Amino acid sequence: MDDQNKNLILATGLSFLVIMVWFFLFPPPEAVTEGEPTVATQQTAVAPSATPDAPTTAVPPDADLPETQRVVIDTPRLQGSISMLGGRLDDLSLKSYHETLDPQSQIVRLLSPVGQPNAYYALYGWTPAGALGYEDVPGANTTWTQVGSGALGVDQPVTLQWDNGKGLVFTRTISVDDHYMFSVAQTVENNSGQAVQLAPYGIVARHGKPLNLQNFFVLHEGVVGRADGKLTETKYDKVAELPQVAREGAQAEVIDAQQDGWIGFTDKYWMTTLIPQQGQPFTSVTKYVPGADIYQAETREQLVTVAPGATAEVSSRLFAGAKEWETIRAYQNEGATEPTEGAEPIPGFIDSIDWGWFFFLTKPIFTVLHWLNHMIGNMGLAIIALTFLLKALVLPLAYKSYVSMARMKELQPELEALRERAGDDKMLMQREMMRLYKEKQVNPAAGCLPILIQIPIFFSLYKVIFVTIELRHAPFFGWLKDLSAPDPSSIFNFFGLAPWAAPTPGTTMALIFIGALPILLGVSMWLQQKLNPAPGDKAQAMIFAWMPWVFMFMLGHFASGLVLYWIVNNLITFTQQYVIMRSHGHHPDIFGNIKASFSRKPAAQPAGKAANDGAAPAKKRKP
């Protein structure tokens, strides 16, 4: 078999091997309900490091907590309530997102109160210092009172108040924008007659791991944070393995930031993040309490001294919602989704989206995909347009590769002559081949490049489709209602024409009876092979024959958006290669190669025909 076919088999085999490794090391996660993420109980905050602190103690999961009044939250994107017990933000749902494709299904619930499975909420408060004790400051079980009445909404803040009975009056004003950002202004009025010291804190806590934890290797779920430009990601298992810190009374990691940062919990599509005032030093803490199985993220700001008769105020923010790219980017660059006076940008906030190892590819790929979707209005068409752009971007390199492939075809008669002269002397054959390649300026490995280039692009697009919420429940046409999910159709029921249901996703039957899109993928790969005749070697010919159908089943249960990309990529590659080969005097006999693939005993081909890749026999030179 000629070297070009060997290179093609090598490149295809390498692609297959990479996908096999990916498939087995990173198997698709089990289907889960995307409704209610897990939630955590809170614990009392730890005093700032400037003073000796008592260890924090979490509220046990089965603790009996008194019924309290609540303040309703109602915005265009959010609904829920704030508990007067601790002033906890512990009841929050996302109006724009449903658990399933059914518009009548429940909306996604993000936060849940203590007493419900996997409690998950945010809490703010003060840590005492100096002469103050924990009974003098508001904490997890403080009962607050609403000043005035009404629900929390856009441009409708609510104010909570608590008097400690010893001259200190604490006030908390909470506001929310039209997306997912809460602003929390905490004030303390000192009427005690003596100066007091205390430090503000924020807590996001979860009871146990999320019920819908996907535990997928390429997906980060757990604590995510940034401190002075450094991003940290800690999965739940790693949080539970943190070293015991006596001062914290728990397993913990403490990071002191000098200028900016944030910390919280991230799921695949949702996030709850504490954002202290930027430009000021603060401490971020990741903590795990084994006895109560509580995961906790904290921010602690600097110690505040309040003179008698004075009032101190500290402001911070809380993001609780969907990781929408445009929204996150607006908070990062402008501090708000709309021009807002005094809004502080949040450095590095876009990295709360899990861009993965290939972030240098996933970020620009998604940026272009998002823009195309905005322009076209259909994510499937945007993926097709993105494929054309990517192919145009690598066309110069692909062109050189295809030209090299065409030149290799021209060398086949000379290579055959070399083989006859060299006989069984492999060293002589290798030396003469290298001399011929150098003389003709041909790179035999260049044919691998078009396939190898696709590998990082394929995995980057896979990452984008898997983690970005913009692809979640994004429809294409017809039966493809969710491009982030596998093709739901099945050959088992003739793609919905038969009166019986398709196999349940994830079952062996579903693995065998794939959908229409994977079949189109196999056909497109098979058609691409027909630009060249089958290899003469029977074993290599069999590998070529089976490769498209193996890929068809391998990729059949990947996201349909990714399979769509691969199909379009194959068709563009087929067209490019065909045009370039014809421009260099080679006319692929596609129909002849297809016919030969169905023949049990392919007819013997003239030497010139074999050498010219299914084209008309070359004219013999006159002696």
Curated annotation (Swiss-Prot):
**UniProt xrefs under InterPro entries:** Membr_insert_YidC (IPR019998), Membr_insert_YidC_N (IPR028053), YidC/ALB3/OXA1/COX18 (IPR001708), YidC/Oxa/ALB_C (IPR028055), YidC_ALB_C (IPR047196), YidC_periplasmic_sf (IPR038221)
Principal location listed in the UniProt entry: membrane
Give an example GO molecular function. membrane insertase activity
Biased composition (Low complexity) is annotated at 601-617
Q: How does it sit in the membrane?
A: Multi-pass membrane protein
Q: Which residues cross the membrane?
A: 8-28, 379-399, 449-469, 507-527, 543-563
Q: How does it assemble?
A: Interacts with the Sec translocase complex via SecD. Specifically interacts with transmembrane segments of nascent integral membrane proteins during membrane integration.
Question: What name appears for this protein in its UniProt entry?
Answer: Membrane protein insertase YidC
- State the gene name recorded for this protein: yidC
